[in-house]
């Protein structure tokens, strides 16, 4: 896998809470991980079905990613997230 994501922040009832970074997917390659640690990547936020922001982070995509990977790999199972937004063209857009 040549893509990778990093959860940089978690939220509880919309309030920031401290967390250690979480990297994915399992088996993430060194290249994407190093780029994430250099603060590269596409910014995203994940939300639950009540519209509460649950986590945010960055994605290093490859030619095969759909950009749903952080949601599918981590957000749904760990936070109950149902949608993801990316920073595009000066604003947050639902994917």
Where are these regions (language model features)?
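Acidic surface patches and DE-rich sequence motifs
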Residues: 11, 48, 87-89
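Tryptophan-centered short beta-strand motifs
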Residues: 91-95
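Acidic, low-complexity, intrinsically disordered interaction modules
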Residues: 54-88
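A short beta-strand micro-motif
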Residues: 40-49
